[in-house]
Curated annotation (Swiss-Prot):
Gene behind the chain: guaC
SUPFAM superfamilies: Inosine monophosphate dehydrogenase (IMPDH) (SSF51412)
Organism in which the protein naturally occurs: Streptococcus pneumoniae (strain JJA)
GO cellular component: cytosol; GMP reductase complex
Entry annotation: catalytic residues: C176 (thioimidate intermediate)
Protein name, as recorded: GMP reductase
Family: Belongs to the IMPDH/GMPR family. GuaC type 2 subfamily.
Length: 328
């Protein structure tokens, strides 16, 4: 039962250092393998319209990073797969569970993407299970990611249906208001939910949401994530598709949730909101900084590679590390 587990989130945890065994953090290997491909970092930008478009997806793939294209340009998905494959790049797309998506999946047989993410706010659903089974039947070589979920039962069911990885996180994101609108979710205890779900998993888990700092990436790996999906830290870059807005002479970028009225174009079943983020520099600068910070984390863990972070000890500090020092 969940009540037997300690409940905590990212800011409540500090990892405990081990003796360093490498001469320089540059020796630390941050690469991870998901399915048949290896990527430079265990992170993936959230598949949201204000985070990535086709150009950003292409930039990420060319750089050796994992990406998941959002599902909000439905007609553009097949041309996108062709565009990527024509350049020798992997194609990674998202689908929903509506009836017409079944026909869409059948159309992919001639040029199947390497990765498909079934992208639903509440992924522990019969509709998701039947879509997993459909994709696995039609495209047996495609790696299927399914989500989002927040319980071990959900992880087990989606894995048993054929999912190759599950995405854990119900509403912990910065622009997600599921917890406010519905009373449900993993907001405020996302890291504990990840730990709980990992115990049931036989396949990779993608932690999705609640990442506020680069150190949270290392913490996610410690608690069992194979890959970490990140929204707000990847939003607001020069390349980001969000609108640039000027307020009192300062540049901001628009960032909104996937179930917001801004994305839906209608105010119904809204579980996302819009915020403005100060405009950042280039996306590659953030990726490089994430890589360097993760290399430092691996060196603190006394390791040489990402998996070594899984074995460090930790302490639950309940917010004390941030007290009086919001600058971090």
């Amino acid at each position: 039962m969940l009540n037997e587990f300690p409940i905590f989130d990212y800011e409540d945890i500090q990892l405990i250092p081990n003796k360093c065994v490498i001469k320089s953090r540059a020796e630390a290997d941050t690469s991870v393998t998901l399915g048949n491909h290896t990527f430079k970092l265990p992170v993936v930008p959230a598949n949201m319209q204000t985070i990535l478009d086709e150009n950003v997806a292409e930039q990420l793939a060319k750089g050796g990073y994992f990406y998941i294209m959002h599902r909000f340009d439905e007609a553009g998905r097949i041309p996108f797969i062709k565009r990527m494959h024509n350049q020798g790049l992997i194609a990674s797309i998202s689908v929903g569970v509506k009836d017409y998506e079944y026909d869409f999946v059948r159309q992919l047989k001639t040029d199947a993407p390497e990765y498909i993410t079934i992208d639903i706010a509440h992924g522990h659903a019969d509709s998701v299970i039947s879509m997993i089974q459909h994709i696995k039947k039609e495209l047996p070589d495609t790696f299927v990611i399914a989500g989002n979920v927040g319980t071990p039962e959900a992880v087990r069911e989606l894995e048993n249906a054929g999912a190759d990885a599950t995405k854990v996180g119900i509403g912990p994101g910065k622009v997600c208001i599921t917890k406010v609108k519905t009373g449900f979710g993993t907001g405020g205890w996302q890291l504990a939910a990840l730990r709980w779900c990992v115990k049931a998993a036989r396949k990779p888990i993608i932690a999705d949401g609640g990442i506020r700092t680069h150190g949270d990436i290392a913490k996610s790996i410690r608690f069992g994530a194979s890959m970490i999906m990140i929204g707000s830290l990847f939003a607001g870059h020069i390349e980001s598709p969000g609108k640039t807005i000027e307020v009192d002479g300062e540049q901001f970028k628009e960032y909104y949730g996937s179930a917001s009225q801004y994305q839906k174009g209608a105010y119904k079943n809204v579980e996302g909101k819009r915020i403005l983020l100060p405009a950042k520099g280039h996306l590659q600068d953030t990726l490089t900084e994430m890589e360097q910070d993760l290399q430092s984390a691996i060196s603190y863990a006394g390791g040489r590679q990402v998996a070594d972070l899984k074995h460090v000890d930790y302490v639950i500090v309940k917010n004390s590390i941030w007290n009086g020092d919001a600058s971090h």
